[in-house]
Amino acid sequence: MPLIKSISGIRGTLENIPGESLSDYDVKQFTLAYLEEIILYESSKTILVGRDARKSGKRISNIIIDVVLNEGYNVIDLGLVTTPTIGIAVKKHKTAGAIMISASHNDEKWNALKLLNSNGEFLHPEEVQKVIKEKKRTQSNKEKPGNLSSYANALDDHINLILSQNFINKNNIASKSIAVAVDGINSVGGVAIPKFLESLGIKKIKKINCNPDGNFNHNPEPLPENITDLCSEMKRGKYQLGIVVDPDADRLVLVDERGEPFGEEYTLVAAAEYLLSKNHGASTCSNLSSTLALKNITEKYGGKYFSSAVGEINVVQVMKEK
């Protein structure tokens, strides 16, 4: 019955025991602390709320929305979105921040609150500590509650932003007649990835576990031992590429035409080499646990490589500084 508080957010199991799990009480208290410590100082008084497809997600979302509205703030409910999508949506809608409800690669017994700032970035460690420290607050219940609206096009906005990049050659991809198999772990990636592939003109898509009902048919962490269904499908020889993601689609693993997983670190290096080949001299950054192959590839194309401490926010911080 753990409740884990870290720089990546507030994560817990679902026994509804206050202080020992991600209980309704704890969700309320952490939401109040987030509003008080982070959102209070922003000019915008609107936050986004999104979730992956876990069965507990809608209930937690309703609790958060109720708290935010009763504090006099506005909510834009994005519904089912990926974690990268909600970060992009913060910038588009110019909101004070966002709460993403997802325990990432953990199983259905878990859920979590991922807290974002007005830049669409995860909170800095010291900001998270403020939220954790100040969570004991009382609901104020303003006389005039905030406004609730819904926005259903966040995934489309994300896809269109990707397609607008000058290094994406949609026509070239469509001309290849590529066949792709996708394992979406029955969460939001099962919607987002096929939609993205279709936008690239890919017509043959095999959907495995792509019904976003929250029934995870295997361990959701995309490790080789957990993605055997996709690997077996690839070995049939009908597809050139396999894609599997975790429940909030912030982790991705590729599988080759032989059914062999192409490791996450190699995916980073391959993507970086493609971008660097079109933008010589550009810089890259990864955390200290990543392969040094990225450094070698960057220097090959005349760029500078920077490293950061482990944690997405640390990588982002170095990118902004350099």
Predicted regions and their residues:
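Short beta-strand-to-turn element immediately C-terminal to the catalytic PLP-Schiff-base lysine
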Residues: 115-118, 253-257
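Conserved beta-strand elements of the Class I
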Residues: 48, 97, 179-181, 285
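A structured phosphate/pyrophosphate-recognition subdomain
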Residues: 3-4, 11-12, 174-199, 288-322
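N-terminal small/polar loop signature for handling phosphorylated ligands or for N-terminal nucleophile
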Residues: 36, 40, 46-110, 195-255
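Short, surface-exposed alpha-helical segments at coil->helix boundaries
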Residues: 57-62, 128, 190-194, 295
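Proline/glycine-rich low-complexity loops and linkers
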Residues: 69, 78, 130-160, 164, ...
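Gly/Ser/Thr-enriched, mixed-charge loops and adjacent short helices
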Residues: 13, 111-235
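An N-terminal, well-structured beta->alpha segment
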Residues: 1-71, 147-179
